[in-house]
Regions:
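Short, structured "edge-of-domain" segments at secondary-structure transitions
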Residues: 1-401
């Protein structure tokens, strides 16, 4: 080694010896250790001084975490069927689909929504209950999967049916109508609950009564009974109350029941009428007489001396409406243009020879935040009216006393 190398090595040895002695001192003397820690912390504070963002407490009683923030936000499609099946489909599976979704034989889609996993769905049942369903809890399926019955999410009774479902959006009002003519209006936010594990009351019903209609508030309300009467009045006549209230009389029920209650908006042109004798017709809404709530109403089908025509289904429609006909064996669709436009005196025209179980309008695809969006509806061009063909029996019955 050169003289210079020897000097450098001796200096390095002295430095290491001093460091070893200092480390021994820190480890063996608690006072020296604390003094070192203080000086180093002061140095950190001097170089990186920022206001403290955390709070130090001796004891923390409760930590609140919003579980909704922990749910991954993902756009999905939710399908609800007439028989009460529900499924959540990823957008990728939905966009790749080329066919209709899989359903049980005789079932059909009632609602289809585009929303995200942090949203909620409101489903109303025939027994006057509602289900507040977080979308993220719905079983995820492929578009071609059947899905699960809604009772797998929230238990409902065997005889309880889902009558309508909605995307939960504050600021919207719903109109609820019962079979015995009770009616009320409820703000959608009134249905929000923190516990979603059981059905909640949406309307107080009497024995043997049931909820038959839940719709978003429209400008006018049209009630139709099974003995062929209608009542048209302003929706503003319906009071706004809470979920547990019974509401007020919308129609004076005696020996009849309300079969349909519709909310009328600017896009609606007709009321579609279907009878127990497999006849159907469309009546222009503009031809109906407007009265006030809780009146007897006017006839929507004239009385027949030999045939007991009774309305089994009725709903508002426009030129885009597709009618879903559920029979004992199958489900078929009829375009609105295939149903004749008639007046309130006519019986309608035969549209099938099969035993009809139910008739509903085909679902309209709904998106979160766009449920109140006004969609321009083309007006139907009426064909020249042909002479009505009626049987000699119906003609003579019109003159019987």
């Amino acid at each position: 080694l050169t003289n210079t190398d020897i000097v450098v090595l001796k200096e390095r040895a002295e430095e290491l010896q001093k460091l070893i002695e200092r480390c021994h001192e820190i480890l063996s003397d608690e006072g020296v250790l604390k003094s070192l820690m203080k000086s180093e912390l002061r140095e950190v504070k001097k170089n990186y001084a920022v206001p403290r963002k955390t709070e130090i407490k001796d004891e923390i009683t409760e930590i609140k975490v919003d579980l909704k923030d922990m749910i991954p936000k993902e756009d999905v499609i939710v399908v609800v069927t007439n028989d009460g099946y529900i499924k959540k489909v990823p957008m990728k599976s939905f966009k790749a689909a080329t066919d209709e979704t899989t359903l049980k034989p005789g079932d059909f889609v009632r609602n289809m929504f585009e929303l995200n996993t942090r949203d909620y769905i409101l489903s109303f049942t025939s027994l006057g209950n509602y289900l507040f369903i977080p979308v993220h809890t719905i079983t995820e399926c492929k578009w071609k999967d059947l899905g699960k019955h809604i009772s797998n999410l929230i238990m409902i009774k065997e005889n309880e049916r889902i009558i309508n479902s909605f995307i939960f959006e504050k600021g919207t009002s719903l109109v609820l109508t019962s079979k015995e003519g009770m009616i009320k209006k409820v703000r959608m936010e009134e249905f929000e609950v923190s516990r979603c594990s059981k059905p909640m009351t949406s309307i107080k019903l009497k024995d043997n009564d049931e909820l038959i209609s839940v719709q978003k508030e429209g400008k006018k309300t049209l009630i139709i009974t099974d003995n062929n009467y209608y009542l048209l009045f302003e929706t503003g006549e319906i009071p706004e109350v809470g979920p547990k209230a019974s509401g007020v009389k919308g129609y004076p029920i005696k020996d009849n029941n309300v079969i349909s209650s519709s909310q009328i908006n600017d896009s609606d042109e007709y009321i579609n009428i279907f009878t127990n004798l497999n006849t159907a017709k469309r009546v222009k809404l503009s031809e109906l007489v407007e009265l006030t709530r809780n009146k007897k109403g006017k006839e929507i089908i004239k009385k027949n001396k030999t045939k007991d025509y009774r309305v089994i289904s009725a709903f508002t429609s426009n030129v885009r409406t597709i009618n879903v006909i559920k029979t004992n064996d199958d489900v078929n669709e009829i375009k609105n243009s295939d149903i004749p436009i008639m007046d309130s005196n006519s019986f309608g025209s035969t549209y099938t020879k099969l035993k009809v179980v139910n008739v509903k309008p085909k679902y309209e695809f709904e998106k979160i935040g766009k449920t109140n969006e006004v969609v321009e509806t083309p007006k139907e061009v009426e064909q020249p009216k042909e002479e009505a063909q009626i049987s000699f029996e119906d003609f003579t019955n019109s003159f019987k006393i």
